[in-house]
Amino acid sequence: MTINRREFIKANAIAAAAAVAGVSVPAVASNLITSSDITKLKWDKAACRFCGTGCSVNVGVMDGKVVATHGDIKSPVNKGLSCVKGYFLSKIMYGKDRLTTPLLRMTNGKYDKEGEFTPISWDQAFNVMAEKANDALKKDGPEALGMFGSGQWTVQEGYAAVKLMKAGFRTNNIDPNARHCMASAVGGFMRTFGIDEPMGCYDDLEAADAFVLWGSNMAEMHPILWTRLTDRRLSAPHVKVAVLSTFEHRSFDLADNGMIFTPQTDLAILNYIANYIIQTGRVNKDFVSKHTNFRLGETDIGYGLRPEHPLEQKAKNNGKTKGSSTPIDFDEYAKFVSTYTVESVSKLSGVPEHKLKELAEMYADPKIKVTSFWTMGFNQHTRGVWANNLVYNIHLLTGKISTPGNSPFSLTGQPSACGTAREVGTFSHRLPADMVVKNPKHRAIAEKIWDLPEGTIPAKPGYHAVLQNRMLKDGKLNFYWVQCNNNMQAAANINEEAYPGYRNPKNFIVVSDPYPTVTAQAADLILPTAMWVEKEGMYGNAERRTQSWYQMVEAPEGAKSDMWQLVEFSKRFKVEDVWPEELIAKKPEVRGKTLFDVLYKDASVGKFPLSEIPEDRLNDESRDFGFYIQKGLFEEYASFGRGHAHDLAPYDRYHKERGLRWPVVNGKETKWRFKEGSDPYCKPGSDWDFYGKPDGRAVIFALPYEPAAESPDEEYDLWLSTGRVLEHWHSGSMTQRVPELYKAMPDALVYMHPDDAKKRNMRRGDLVKLISRRGEVQTRVETRGRNKPPVGLVYMPWFDASRLVNKVTLDATDPLSKETDYKKCAIKIVKV
């Protein structure tokens, strides 16, 4: 039998569809009956490299190269389906400009900040890194060192980085790019429930009667979940979908109630819904009385800008504990939200009254099971934590939580923003399993697990992502290592903060990346990095599902994984180089040892021999280090959460499964947390138990609407919102190197309302400048297509390295989560 490429693609699609439908697969669609070339493929499972959905894909390898991928029919997440990015996964590793040797800026054979990138060996790279790190340590101590990591790190990479920075170099100046996307979600969970990550799971997609999207374009950003939601909507006539956004996008195609609101007024809409529930007598009084407390939050907390910024000076609560709150009762809460009437909120938000009432009734009706989804529209918000708290309020007031179909659900954007950034604790203030560096008991637990002297881990939280850029610019952060992200393209206010910091002569910047990204080109040293299935690893997705994969192919010669780089670099430092004598005196047996010895080889990380790796499996990192390092890192990390409601299964089990949702207790995963009968950590007889709080009660917060940091005025008369598109992922450093995806969406355009274009004498395709108080960027006008902004707002995606929209954005952050607001700033547009 012969089969051409087109038939093969069609056959895969048939197989996936048949699997979902539960019907038999035609012979032409079976992987077992193919052409002779295709039967040479070796297939294995892996978690997708892109978004936080956590699809499983089958990866086809031939002649040492990934040549095909398709949706994994055994996956409970995607059930054989794949989005367009996942379909082209096989091409992301084979861009023509893949890096294979370290590159150092040099002039006449010596390092020079203004020199040209010159190939050097790995030994030379580590030598200059060690020299620069030691110089910074001797001059200004551990606070002069920093690292910016990623929600794309594997679990093991993130854990290795946390140990190296917080235990080895004794600095908390490590933060992930998840600070830009998930920090507000973390803050919301911790404030309301005292514990992080969603209580629901993707099974809610088949159980809910209604879905509400808050600042989430699932149709493009989470297309596989959108497929499941669409199937539920179209197969069950009673199911309804509401979509709220500041502009119309593809998710509105399915909306029964689509609402365009004025930026920042989602806060007022959320309070109106709470008021409606109370005024119509639909509060679940039994649930509320048994399982919740009420608190009034601090207000007017500023915008996370530099302290000297006029907006920070103006904030009445500037300088106080911005996340503090005081107890109130239900009546006081009801009075607080009573001012958010349908009339006033409609006027403020621009949403018609009947649409607001329809939305509120959906939540209020006790017969309707509601799942709320949100992503960056909520989180990238100067009041992002508040927005998260306020949507929880609605679910708590009605008791619509932690049962099938009733979930407030924060969706993640990166493959392991949950599994690595949040669960491992790669944030500047966190440790694994929701522990924090400020808590002495938590530090003691970490020091015990890591077998460190008491006092090794510093108590002061480190510099968060935005503050890292400011400290680089100010010359206070001098040795800086960036891994697995493209922050020079992703960070807000590039012109004024990010770029000046990278090019500050006082600083030495290292960037680890497979490709010469914008960030890499701003660095002093570039390290070539292995990608995805060129290494063994694990990711954790948005529904608490941890997944693993084996190494399937060799990286290009010279490219090394992020984990290998971190652990190998640790060999360059003896304990005496980085720890004070009084600390070493508490554990004299470490004297003379390297950080590699203390943190990895001689720790519990190093106790799993190479013989535990299956003989037929590649594992370059472990064979370099002499022990099964991925298993060792995972098992040590997992010890933080076992018995503390973050339980993970034994490492080897994950290789046999399509992931497991934690907590995994007695071998069984957990679908819905905080509900007795589903969550093993709930106390018997509790019904619901929000055990993250000492009294088992979740908190309903009274928090007001407050305006955005920057709004349009006479000169800068337009709102700018940024985001993504279906075809590209984040900065496009992978997807723009896939020819098919690049051709489908080659350039980032600015989407405008036709009336705004006409007013400025602009037409579709015109070259224009977007200008803010901080910078400008050129692009072309689009007045048609998938994104339809209202009058007064424009939308521009940020995937295009040739059109850096973050030159114009404002680096305002949520003062609680320190997450950047990329959705709201003021600009003007002029023709070029």
Swiss-Prot record:
The entry's cellular-component GO terms read: membrane; nitrate reductase complex; periplasmic space
Q: Which HAMAP family is this protein grouped with?
A: Nitrate_reduct_NapA (MF_01630)
- Residues in 4Fe-4S Mo/W bis-MGD-type domain copies: 41-97
Cofactor(s) of this protein = [4Fe-4S] cluster; Mo-bis(molybdopterin guanine dinucleotide)
Q: Where, in this chain's numbering, is substrate bound?
A: W798
Q: Could you tell me the EC number(s) of this protein?
A: 1.9.6.1
Q: What is this protein called?
A: Periplasmic nitrate reductase
| Family of this protein | Belongs to the prokaryotic molybdopterin-containing oxidoreductase family. NasA/NapA/NarB subfamily.
Give binding positions for [4Fe-4S] cluster. C48, C51, C55, C83
Signal sequence segment: 1-29
Q: The organism sits in which domain of life? A: Bacteria
- Quick one: a GO biological-process term for this protein? nitrate assimilation
Which keywords belong to this entry? 4Fe-4S, Electron transport, Iron, Iron-sulfur, Metal-binding, Molybdenum, Nitrate assimilation, Oxidoreductase, Periplasm, Signal, Transport
The record's annotation in CDD domains points to:
MopB_CT_Nitrate-R-NapA-like (cd02791), MopB_Nitrate-R-NapA-like (cd02754)
**Compartment list:** Periplasm
Q: Where does Mo-bis(molybdopterin guanine dinucleotide) bind?
A: 85, 152, 177, 181, 214-221, 245-249, 264-266, 376, 380, 486, 512-513, 535, 562, 722-731, 806, 823
Entry GO MF terms: 4 iron, 4 sulfur cluster binding; electron transfer activity; iron ion binding; molybdenum ion binding; molybdopterin cofactor binding; nitrate reductase (cytochrome) activity
| InterPro entries xrefs | Asp_de-COase-like_dom_sf, CT_Nitrate-R-NapA-like, MoPterin_dinucl-bd_dom, Mopterin_OxRdtase, Mopterin_OxRdtase_4Fe-4S_dom, MopterinOxRdtase_cofactor_BS, Periplasm_NO3_reductase_lsu, Prok_molybdopt-oxidoreductase
Which reaction(s) are listed as its catalytic activity? 2 Fe(II)-[cytochrome] + nitrate + 2 H(+) = 2 Fe(III)-[cytochrome] + nitrite + H2O
Biological source species:
Colwellia psychrerythraea (strain 34H / ATCC BAA-681) (Vibrio psychroerythus)
Function (record text):
Catalytic subunit of the periplasmic nitrate reductase complex NapAB. Receives electrons from NapB and catalyzes the reduction of nitrate to nitrite.
Q: How does it assemble?
A: Component of the periplasmic nitrate reductase NapAB complex composed of NapA and NapB.
Lineage, top ranks: Bacteria, Pseudomonadati, Pseudomonadota, Gammaproteobacteria, Alteromonadales
SMART domains the UniProt entry points to = Molybdop_Fe4S4
**Cofactor binding remark:** Binds 1 [4Fe-4S] cluster. Binds 1 molybdenum-bis(molybdopterin guanine dinucleotide) (Mo-bis-MGD) cofactor per subunit.
Q: How is the polypeptide modified once translated?
A: Predicted to be exported by the Tat system. The position of the signal peptide cleavage has not been experimentally proven.
Q: Main localization of the protein?
A: periplasm
